[in-house]
Amino acid sequence: MIAHLRGTLLSKQPGQAIVECAGVGYDVAISVPTFTALPAEGAEVRLHIHTQVSEDAIALFGFLDREEKRLFERLITVSGVGPKLAIKMLSGLSPERTVAALRAQDHASLTRIPGVGKKLAERLVVELKDKLDDLIAAAPAAGPVAAGPAAEDVLSALLNLGYQRPAALKAIETAVEKDAAAGEDFDLLFRAALKLIR
């Protein structure tokens, strides 16, 4: 099993990175938080790897942060959560927000993630809420989960545009503080946050 890769980052895009090690290019699935934290293409990168072996394929899932990998591996222990859905979850909500939502039994935040319905959200909470003490500390209440339904989508959009997570979070929170209604409307919040982040 591959547990760690160190090599040259040949290419990156949301959801995927290709890392060359000793002349071999490894196709690695990644979350949005990992994508936004990767160095420039051509730089050396180190990834913690989870290897998933199936009958017809071997898939690699990579993480810059060891804690994110541990949370990913905890998520896939839940029935109905495969590696691809776990990556979507960590992209739709940051690892910190995922832990916070599970601990708070916040089904609404979990069901905003594509592929996570009400029953799966309930199962995630039941199976994991007491198994997170050794993982990432829950994020404070302020931020996208508390800022309104559009906040997570706007955060994801800003990260995909290349903005750093702390700056994006601050812009979203400031926009909602100025106009609470912005938290309910993606277009309104996105435009407001974009003006603030620039």
Swiss-Prot record:
UniProt-listed SMART domains: HhH1 (SM00278)
Keywords associated with the record: Cytoplasm, DNA damage, DNA recombination, DNA repair, DNA-binding
Main location (coarse class): cytoplasm
MF annotations from Gene Ontology: ATP binding; four-way junction DNA binding; four-way junction helicase activity
Chain segments annotated as coiled-coil in the UniProt record: none
One annotated Gene Ontology cellular component of this protein: cytoplasm
Chain positions covered by the region annotation Domain III: 146-198
Region (Domain I): 1-64
Compartmental location: Cytoplasm
Notes concerning its domains: Has three domains with a flexible linker between the domains II and III and assumes an 'L' shape. Domain III is highly mobile and contacts RuvB.
Subunit organization: Homotetramer. Forms an RuvA(8)-RuvB(12)-Holliday junction (HJ) complex. HJ DNA is sandwiched between 2 RuvA tetramers; dsDNA enters through RuvA and exits via RuvB. An RuvB hexamer assembles on each DNA strand where it exits the tetramer. Each RuvB hexamer is contacted by two RuvA subunits (via domain III) on 2 adjacent RuvB subunits; this complex drives branch migration. In the full resolvosome a probable DNA-RuvA(4)-RuvB(12)-RuvC(2) complex forms which resolves the HJ.
Descriptive protein name: Holliday junction branch migration complex subunit RuvA
Taxon lineage: Bacteria, Pseudomonadati, Acidobacteriota, Terriglobia, Terriglobales
Gene name linked to the record: ruvA
